Curated annotation (Swiss-Prot):
Species this chain originates from: Salmonella newport (strain SL254)
Gene Ontology molecular functions: DNA binding
Protein name according to UniProt: Cell division activator CedA
DNA-binding as UniProt keyword: yes
Keyword annotations from UniProtKB, A to Z: Cell cycle, Cell division, DNA-binding
HAMAP family registered for this protein in UniProt: CedA
């Protein structure tokens, strides 16, 4: 007899999309860019959308992070 794939009594955890927090305490703000912070040696953009911050993936170049932030801003302007 084959075993069932799932444990029968284990509850199914429903997925809740993660809301990124504001930039953490140890992030260093870059003065030359509007939304870019340095985090663990990488460049990360934080954009406030509505009530919450959206965080970009880590980029190795600050310009890329800022481009991402600009794109997110544009998308949200269209959505509003």
């Amino acid at each position: 007899m084959m075993k069932p794939l799932r444990q029968q009594n284990r509850q199914i955890i429903s997925y809740i999309p993660r809301v990124e927090p504001a930039p953490p305490e140890h992030a260093i703000k870059m003065d030359t860019f509007r939304d870019v912070w340095i985090l663990r040696g990488k460049y990360v953009a934080f954009v406030l959308t509505g009530e919450s911050f959206q965080r970009s993936p880590a980029f190795s170049v600050p310009e890329s992070a800022q481009r991402w932030a600009n794109q997110v801003r544009q998308e949200n302007e269209i959505a509003d």
